[in-house]
């Protein structure tokens, strides 16, 4: 009987060790859980960025206002008869 109890105790200790410290144990679970959370956060940022880019593409495909806005902001172009005025911030 004593041998059986010692055997069960050793088996329980072995199972507990593998649960806490072994492959796919609690430590791996917590590490992977935090990695998944950070990846989900990164994915949310990328989804938002993709939605903005998709909206820009649709605006460029459907109308001239988006093209005109980009030409003004990125290339510094102006329409005929317009006067371009740039206000610079005061130096400190």
From Swiss-Prot:
UniProt superkingdom: Bacteria
Indicate yes or no for the key word Cell inner membrane. Answer: yes
| Segments forming a coiled coil | 40-73
An example Gene Ontology cellular component term from the record? cell division site
Give any single GO term for biological process. FtsZ-dependent cytokinesis
Q: Where does it reside?
A: Cell inner membrane
Q: Which UniProt keywords apply?
A: Cell cycle, Cell division, Cell inner membrane, Cell membrane, Coiled coil, Membrane, Transmembrane, Transmembrane helix
Q: What is its main location?
A: membrane
Q: Which residues lie on this side of the membrane: Cytoplasmic?
A: 1-3
Which of the residues are on side Periplasmic?
Answer: 22-92
Family matches, as Pfam families: DivIC (PF04977)
Topology of the protein relative to the lipid bilayer: Single-pass type II membrane protein
Known InterPro entries for this protein? Cell_div_FtsB, FtsL/DivIC
Which ranges does the record mark as transmembrane?
Answer: 4-21
What this protein is reported to do is described as:
Essential cell division protein. May link together the upstream cell division proteins, which are predominantly cytoplasmic, with the downstream cell division proteins, which are predominantly periplasmic.
**Self-association state and partner proteins as the record states:** Part of a complex composed of FtsB, FtsL and FtsQ.
Tell me which NCBIfam families the record gives: PRK00888.1 (NF002058)
Q: Which PANTHER family match?
A: CELL DIVISION PROTEIN FTSB
Name of the protein: Cell division protein FtsB
- Species in which this protein is naturally found: Pseudoalteromonas translucida (strain TAC 125)
Q: What is the lineage of its organism?
A: Bacteria, Pseudomonadati, Pseudomonadota, Gammaproteobacteria, Alteromonadales
């Amino acid at each position: 009987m004593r041998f059986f109890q010692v055997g069960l105790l050793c088996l329980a200790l072995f199972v507990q060790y593998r649960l806490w410290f072994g492959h796919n144990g609690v430590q791996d679970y917590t590490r992977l859980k935090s990695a998944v959370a950070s990846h989900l956060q990164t994915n949310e940022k990328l989804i938002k960025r993709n939605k903005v880019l998709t909206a820009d593409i649709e605006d460029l495909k459907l109308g001239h206002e988006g093209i005109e806005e980009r030409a003004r902001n990125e290339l510094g172009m102006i329409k005929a008869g317009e006067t371009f005025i740039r206000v610079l911030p005061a130096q400190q």
